[in-house]
Amino acid sequence: MSNGTKVKKRDGRIESLDLDKMHLMVEEACTGLAGVSASQVEMKSGIQFYDGITTGEIQEILIRSASDLISLDNPNYQFVAARLLLFGVQKQVFNTRWKDSEIYPPLGDIVLRNIDHGVYDKDILNYYEKEEIDQCNSFIRHNRDLTFTYAGLQQIVDKYLVQDRSTNEVFETPQFMYMMISATLFAKYPTVSYTHLTLPTNREV
């Protein structure tokens, strides 16, 4: 459903405002949380739509609305606000719609793309084979990002995620960040010489 308002997408395209998509996004942010209401978030936002409003502005208004609803009686709005913030981060990093956020690109693709962007050091490829990067990817649990509170996720986005500070474009999600920090720290770790190896055995305990 559209009210005729034109919105500016992150990539610069102009499209008709899809109110249904906005409603679904807020509802998704509230899914599984007790004591929260998607309609309350939308009403609290008091969004004044105008031609040319950006999707980023709409996202920020909704995040602020959910944040303003956080109280001792309604603490779960901190997770609603965090999820709305996360949807925006995922949109930038995955380049996909929020509702397709479970279609995650593999770590290897993120590494190569961010090397091309100049935000990851290409030297990391000298220490890890593709198979090892794929194995690292298998350890990532993206749904862990849904456990952040709003304050916690905002701190990570503002201070720790790799991004272009001039445009605020973000290049990684928290789970990708954690994995890349670990991979970078242990890239030169002399596992064999220190004999710090864990080998699987068939011994019953």
What kind of feature is each model-predicted range?
Residues 1-197, 203:
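Extended catalytic cores of very large enzyme megasubunits
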